[in-house]
Amino acid sequence: RRNKRGPVSLSDVQANAVSRYDLHDPELNRVLGGGLVPGSLILLGGEPGIGKSTLLLQTLLRLTDRKVLYISGEESEQQIKLRADRLAPSASGNNCLLLCETNLERIFEQLRDVSPDLLIIDSIQTMATETIDSAPGSLSQIRTCAAEFLKYAKSSATPVLLVGHITKDGA
């Protein structure tokens, strides 16, 4: 939602106290300023293999009070389940829904049906929309898909966590 009135003084803005999502991890909550803000989009970036997916899976297994949709464009349901069992053998995972999909339009069909409390996209480089004629991972695909996830986060007040891979040259 854009302000159609023009610029306003920061001191005139009324800020309501926002209830953040407690991630049940003191350090992660601290890094995020006290937890996840509803409607926010967080990019978790780093080189491939450093543990971004593992960190997010470990986090969502702690969130027994939230419905989490974990969308993977890189791993199968079985691979994710094996890693989850290794990380938290006693966790039920009942709050976690898995979707192995890379097509943006099909993902949004599922989002309308599921309405998660938290959305995890692993990774943004694997996502693609049919509206752009380029390969997944191209700059135009990444920008467009990330913009659509941001719109979803803002319109639904759902926090979205995006995994992004950074190559050795920083791309």
Description of each model-found segment:
Residues 140-165:
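Substrate-engagement module of ASCE P-loop NTPases
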Residues 109-121:
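Proline-aspartate-enriched helix->loop->beta-strand connector
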Residues 17-20, 45, 92-101, 128-143:
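Flexible beta-alpha connector loops of hexameric P-loop NTPases
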Residues 67, 94-95, 115-118, 155-162:
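Loop/turn-to-beta-strand initiation segments
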Residues 28-31, 44, 80, 122, ...:
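Conserved RecA-like P-loop NTPase ATPase core
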Residues 1-2, 161:
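Non-catalytic accessory segments flanking P-loop/AAA+ NTPase cores
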Residues 48-50, 74-78, 86, 102-106, ...:
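Conserved nucleotide-binding/hydrolysis micro-motifs of P-loop NTPases
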